[in-house]
């Protein structure tokens, strides 16, 4: 009886169970409607904002990152969110991760730009073209902000390098 139950359970889903992962759809097939632009823009700004934990982007540590690390602010209280930045005392759980966060935002912006380029070939209505233009402008602005943030943190001053080095990787495509 046990063997019959196990064989019934093991074979009962084979006809209707989708075995392909839901995230296996290529980007240009998944982002194929102008109606998806608004949720994509919301996701882009949510990625820029982050959450309130200490490894977040604009919701937490980036706002004070330069000031605290440059001694403009003294964060000497041990319970403060900025004390690990001030003391430069990092571990796996509290690393500010200021390299990966902007690149995550840049990747999201590049995906939105790719979707806009793919949709631009398909849309014919002026209203849809205006939505595409708006989404494209927002993605370009957020991507530029993330690149600027990387330059503020990692690039050397222009006077030291005469503009010969960028200080970070410039990502304009996926």
Label the model's feature ranges:
Residues 13-63:
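Membrane-proximal, proline-rich intrinsically disordered regions
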Residues 62-71, 129-135:
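Acidic helix-start/capping segments at beta-turn-to-alpha-helix junctions
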Residues 23-25, 125-128, 173-174:
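Short linear capping/connector segments at secondary-structure termini
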Residues 78-154:
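Conserved, well-structured interaction surfaces
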Residues 1-11:
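Sec-dependent bacterial lipoprotein signal peptides
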Residues 36-39, 69, 174:
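Hydrophobic-face positions in mid-chain alpha helices that act as interaction patches
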Residues 49-55, 146-157:
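Secretory-pathway/luminal and periplasmic proteins that interact with or process carbohydrate-rich
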Residues 159-174:
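Short, flexible helix-coil linker/hinge segments at the edges of structured domains or between repeats
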